Swiss-Prot record:
UniProt similarity note: Belongs to the PlsX family.
Function: Catalyzes the reversible formation of acyl-phosphate (acyl-PO(4)) from acyl-[acyl-carrier-protein] (acyl-ACP). This enzyme utilizes acyl-ACP as fatty acyl donor, but not acyl-CoA.
Entry-linked SUPFAM superfamilies: Isocitrate/Isopropylmalate dehydrogenase-like
Biological pathway: Lipid metabolism; phospholipid metabolism
Catalytic activity: a fatty acyl-[ACP] + phosphate = an acyl phosphate + holo-[ACP]
Location(s), subcellular: Cytoplasm
Lineage: Bacteria, Pseudomonadati, Thermodesulfobacteriota, Syntrophobacteria, Syntrophobacterales
Alphabetical GO biological process terms: fatty acid biosynthetic process; phospholipid biosynthetic process
Protein name in the entry: Phosphate acyltransferase
A Pfam match: FA_synthesis
InterPro entries: FA_synthesis, Phospholipid_synth_PlsX-like
The keyword Iron appears for this protein: no
Main location: cytoplasm
UniProt source species: Syntrophobacter fumaroxidans (strain DSM 10017 / MPOB)
Length: 353
């Protein structure tokens, strides 16, 4: 197995990417290729004292974090991200990990590697720890806006992914909204509600943010803007809780080396983004993991380990197979057509009363 790491992508590249790749290496049964400026990467590896465990692939260009993704891909065909995705598309590597420009990661994966047939676009999936287990969030940031069909297709991806990852035969899917009623939310959310209610998925209806962690759903669907805001709020809250508990212990003079310390460490490991590592880009035909832009070495190492695990279990390959065999996308298209016809009938009937 070979994993390509976009070593020039991210706020702390390339240092954090190289350090993370070196950390992941001993626990990942894969050859790791780091893609980027050869002179700079080789210098970092020499300085680390380990210049042989990673293979350097030269890339003369870098896509910046603030660049428009699709345009940057067209202009920078020899960027580290572009080369990594090209290697994946050509079967030279088995997975790609990048902490770079998320718009560029999504665009490169979509156009160079390709989508599952019938799918309009991919979605980032992030498992959020809750007291009752994990809650899968889609979309966590691949696309800021979404139509009803995009939201419904994300629900199909969540359904199929949870079948593989969690062994759930009928995972409960909720639609993130500001209220439980069908008429709540914007047009896209209202239409997605109507569409999902017609499908054979285990759709539980709208779910409000205050009910997200009550164990009522296994996955929650939203557009990438809302999902990314929710994810970062969640990350910020968990970090604040850790700091609050530490400051409380210091203020009270308590010793956190015993049981309380183990509880705090368990909380940090369960809820801190570094230990999640990255988000699989569901809907892409091959394994792509997008790491947080601010990732440092620990997060990068965990993102690489996640990519390694997903590839070993053939999750992306199996996901594509289940999506096609399940027939959910075909059903979705059919129900979307029927919904459009019904809505036109209602509109026509109203206009001719």
């Amino acid at each position: 197995m070979k994993i390509a790491v976009d070593a020039m992508g991210g706020d702390h590249a390339p240092e954090a990417l190289i350090e993370g790749a070196l950390l992941a290496g001993p626990q990942c049964s894969a050859d790791i290729l780091v893609i980027g400026n050869e002179a700079r990467l080789s210098s970092l590896l020499a300085h680390s004292g380990d210049s042989t465990s990673l293979k350097v692939v030269h890339a003369p260009q870098v896509i910046g974090m603030g660049e428009a993704g699709p345009m940057a891909l067209r202009r920078k065909r020899e960027a580290s991200l572009t080369i990594a995705m090209r290697l994946l598309a050509e079967n030279e590597v088995d997975a790609v990990v990048s902490a770079g420009n998320s718009s560029a990661v999504v665009s490169a994966a979509r156009h160079l590697v390709g989508l599952i047939p019938g799918l309009r676009r991919p979605a980032m999936a992030v498992p959020l720890p809750t007291p009752s287990g994990k809650l899968l969030l889609l979309d966590a940031g691949a696309h800021a806006e979404a139509t009803a069909i995009h939201l419904a297709q994300s629900a199909v991806l969540a359904h199929c992914y949870l079948k593989i990852e969690e062994g759930l035969n009928r995972p409960r899917i909720g639609l993130l909204n500001i209220g439980h009623e069908p008429a709540k939310g914007n047009r896209a959310v209202q239409r997605a509600f109507a569409l999902l209610r017609r499908c054979s998925l285990e759709f539980t209806g709208n779910v409000e943010p205050n009910d997200l962690f009550a164990g009522k759903v296994d996955a929650v669907i939203c557009d990438g803007f809302v999902g990314n805001v929710l994810l970062k709020m969640y990350e910020g809250f968990s970090e604040t809780v850790c700091r609050f508990l530490e400051s409380l212990a210091n203020h009270d003079g308590r010793d956190f080396s015993g049981g309380a310390g183990r509880i705090l460490e368990r909380f940090r490991r369960d809820y801190h983004y570094e230990f999640v590592g990255g988000a699989p880009l569901l809907g892409i035909r091959k394994t792509v993991v997008a790491a947080h832009g601010r990732s440092r070495a620990t997060a990068i190492a965990n993102a690489i380990r996640l990519a390694c695990r997903l590839q070993e279990a053939r999750v992306f390959e199996r996901l594509a197979g289940i999506v096609e065999e399940d027939g959910a996308l075909t059903e979705l298209r059919h129900q979307n057509t029927l919904l459009m016809i019904d809505q036109l009938k209602d509109k026509w009937g109203f206009a001719h009363r």
